Design a protein with these regions (language model features):
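N-terminal, intrinsically disordered, highly charged
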Residues: 1-304
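Short pocket-lining segment of the protein kinase catalytic domain that shapes the ATP-binding cleft
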Residues: 309
């Protein structure tokens, strides 16, 4: 299965072709490949990405004894096969606020792609269908810069597409409400802070959704503490991971203030008091269902309250 140039006809990955290539390269036996095809034909969900299906079969990697053909290993293999760079998507290294405006959520979902970097020279797009090019010319024309392609894990592309665009929508919604109100105090009142301590749903406020994302993301990244720091132009959220602080998102200043107020409410702190340091505690659930208690501390600064969790 040779790599295709962008001028070649588009071709979706085919399970039969991929298994044949894995057999020819010594990763699988022919018997195992045929067994996989039989299972696939009888499967209810035939829409699963071929690499995800192969990985789900927990097959032994004959070229690396003792190792399974896991999804990430298969993604690296596919990138080499397509002669495109491989990328393991690290959300800590992606400027979500910069990449989400590059295309609509519908466009990203339709083509199963995700923008992962942008600079003055190019836009880097992750895809798990390296031989499909139909979206490239339209996107390059709209963005007025070349497209640099990378191959990434299809599961990660789907998960982070949903996560990044949901966060961007919440930030945009919260900021637009603030701009309509035109003042910080009314913005915080509108949020009805503390009114939704239950599990967030689609009807919750934008700020509640952002705070919920913040907790989930911190647990996913195994952050030891979270810093929310106001600035004149942009507030920032930073996670400490393995002793190093990483900036994970920058919010408009008014949104940063509202996030801090939401957290103060959850921690049973005095929302109205902004000139004195305060301490509080909040209990929340980890993604695996465990309960954890977070300590909250606020400190007044020239641009609002800084919070450390």
């Amino acid at each position: 299965m040779p790599a295709h140039a962008s001028s070649a006809p588009d071709r979706l990955l085919d399970l039969n072709d991929l298994l044949r290539e894995l057999v020819s390269q010594g990763y699988l036996t022919q018997a195992t490949a045929e067994q996989c095809l039989t299972i696939r034909r009888s499967a209810v969900n035939n829409q699963q990405h071929p690499l995800e299906f192969i990985a789900s079969q927990q097959l032994d990697d004959l070229r690396h004894p003792g190792r399974k053909l896991e999804l990430e290993h298969l993604t690296v293999w596919l990138a080499a096969l397509a002669n495109q760079p491989y990328l393991r998507i690290d959300p800590l290294k992606i400027d979500v606020a910069a990449v989400t405006p590059l295309m609509s959520y519908a466009f990203a979902q339709r083509h199963k792609i995700l923008a992962v970097a942008v600079d003055k020279d190019a836009v880097t797009i992750a895809s798990a269908q390296p031989f499909v090019h139909k979206w490239e010319s339209d996107l390059a024309h709209v963005l007025k810069r070349p497209i640099k392609r990378v191959v990434a894990n299809p599961g990660d592309i789907q998960r982070f597409t949903v996560e990044f665009f949901r966060l961007a929508k919440s930030v945009s919604g919260a900021n637009s409400i603030d701009q309509k109100l035109g003042n910080f105090g009314n913005f915080e009142q509108l949020l009805k802070l503390g009114a939704s301590d239950q599990e967030p749903d689609a009807n919750d406020s934008h700020i509640v959704n952002i705070v919920d994302w913040l907790f989930q993301y911190a647990f996913q990244q195994r952050a030891s503490d979270i810093h929310i720091e106001p600035r004149r132009e942009q507030g920032s959220v930073r996670f400490r991971i393995d002793g190093v602080l990483h900036t994970v998102y920058q919010f408009p200043p008014q949104v940063t203030m509202a996030i801090v107020s939401r957290l103060k409410s959850l921690g049973r702190m005095n929302i109205a008091e902004k000139r004195k340091p305060q301490d509080g505690r909040v209990k929340t659930k980890t993604p695996d269902g465990g309960e954890v208690e977070l300590r909250l501390s606020t400190l007044p600064t020239a641009f609002g309250e800084k919070m450390v969790m």
